[in-house]
Amino acid sequence: MKRRVLSLFLIAVLVLSVVGCGSSTATTTKKETLKVGMEIGYPPFEYYDTDGTTVIGVDVELAKALGEKMGMDVQLVDTAWDGIFAGLDKGDYDCITSAVTITPDRLLDYEFSDPYIKNYQCIVTLKNAAVQPTKPEELKNLKVGYQEETTSDIFLTDLITATGMKCETSEYAKVLDVFNDLQIGRLDAVLCDSTVASSYLGTGSLYKQTWIQSTEPEEFGVCIKKGNSALTTKINSALAELKKDGTLDTILAKYF
């Protein structure tokens, strides 16, 4: 009889333990998800690895590191550059981490994190090009390509307006296409971010950087919807930790 009572007691304890565990699991708080907009196809910041499916790059690793510091899952949302700010306005994602330059005009409409990298405008040609401009004014009468609605676009437009310089300009949706056309001879030169040019240069490269801006560096930051100061504060706090513990330096050293 005692054994039977003891057995029933142990079974009851076991059942209660299982129920208790199930209840604990069910009430576990689910992580929030940080949706990050980016234009995949902008090396070395966000682009597909050689397998054609894995997304890698500075901004990809930065977004994941920020999410980890904030205790959030990260979902990358691939978006065309010419619609990337509209997507943020509509709420398609919470922020943009896509080599976004912090500019006075953009600060009127959006919030930005503290900067995480500096950038300069530069000119790139083929190594064997007959004409290799050593300053922007030497783009005169050349076929010049750049990505639309970027600071390269703004830089060249302002230069043409200020100097009256004439050149044949071609704008592209993706920087990859700009360099493809430079390679096959449709363009004489490319105006782009120095951080982007770095991924096309080096030993065995077909390209040569012939000029780089020496003053007024640009700075990239995480772009956040105006009024979402709570997220801006969280991102800045996480970014400060990444700078302090060396994670950001490690990410940058991997690609530059």
Model-predicted segments: where are they?
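Short, low-complexity disordered leader/linker segments with a strong preference
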Residues: M1-T33
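Ligand-binding clefts/hinges and TM-proximal coupling segments of bilobed small-molecule sensing domains
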Residues: S23-A26, D73-Q75, T151-S170, G202-I212, ...
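Flexible hinge/capping segments at coil-to-helix
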Residues: T27-T28, L126-V144
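Extracytoplasmic small-molecule ligand-binding "clamshell" domains
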Residues: T28-V100, E171
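Short loop->beta-strand "edge-of-pocket" segments that line small-molecule binding or catalytic clefts
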Residues: K35-M38, P136-S152
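Periplasmic-binding protein-like
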Residues: I40, K118-K127, S194, S198-A240, ...
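Alpha-to-beta junction loops
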Residues: G71-D73, D89-S98, L142-K143, K174, ...
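A ligand-binding cleft/hinge motif common to bilobed small-molecule-binding domains
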Residues: G83, V100-D109, F155-D158, D181-I184, ...
